Amino acid sequence: SEMCIRDRYKSRYWDGKIRLFNTQTGQIYVGLLDRVVQFCKDHEYTYEFKESEFYGLPFEVNEFISKEGVKDYMHSICKHSPREYQIEGVYDALRHNRKLLISPTASGKSLMIYSIVRYYVEKKQSILIVVPTTSLVEQMYKDFADYGWDVGSYCHKIYAGKERETDSQVIITTWQSIYKLPRKYFDRFSVVIGDEAHQFKSKSLVSIMGKLGDAKYRFGFTGTLSGSQTHKWVLEGLFGPSYKIIKTNELMKKGHVASLDINVLLLKHPPTRFETFEDEVQYIIT
């Protein structure tokens, strides 16, 4: 829990830092592999990859995934027409197995998540979708239904008071509801999707992702990495390299979101001291 983490910090059992490289095991998150490779190139080190029985090679690319195929698939599973950048995002995710997709508010992240979920459901994979709040659990479930899916037959919601044990292929949950659960609970999941990943607490996210040992397919979605409660490199390490799908100003130009005008009111006044906060407020507004 958050209090337990704080106690460990105060008692000096933990210095408050998340370490991406484990000096004891010599392991680093595979999502940071591109940075390791760049480090080797910069320092003229040689390197080689050894194939894993389960994961294959870390730079595995699914060549059979085509952009046209993804486009046709997204049109076939949804009554809403996907936008070009949404197709691009889903294509990039399915092609590389691991991605941190950065897409701003109102860009339609739920449609991209829905498309990825539908693809892996058809592949008979079990999927864990993790979100930061109970309202987002309900919103995601509702969005899937709005897209025309028989969501009740495939999805199960978990948050305070909800049953955690289920045979449903897709689980939508808050991270708070599952991060204390034992590793055995996570064994059946081969796909994990984190929405609004920047809102997760680092230690809790690391705990969840660390228990998902058999989850080969990992996708994080976030609107921004600025002001994140979790460092960008932690998110990339856990999910994969970041990929910016589209910017807010591009959405405005295309008419997908309302245009924004910002008027800055700059008040110039000499420095003045006040006896109370209320006096200062009255001075500012009069």
Describe each model-derived feature in a short phrase.
Residues 111-115, 119-146:
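Conserved Walker A/P-loop ATP-binding site and its immediately adjacent core
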Residues 55-102:
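Conserved pre-motif I regulatory segment
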Residues 160-191, 202-207:
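Conserved helix/coil segment N-terminal to the catalytic DExD/H
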Residues 7-60:
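Interdomain "pre-motor" coupling segment immediately N-terminal to P-loop NTPase/helicase cores
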Residues 96-118:
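Walker A/P-loop
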Residues 198-261:
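Post-DEXD/H (motif II) to motif III coupling segment of the RecA-like Helicase ATP-binding lobe
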Residues 246-286:
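Conserved interdomain linker/interface between the two RecA-like ATPase lobes of SF2 helicase motors
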Residues 3-5:
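Short, small-residue-biased leader/transition segments that mark boundaries at the very start
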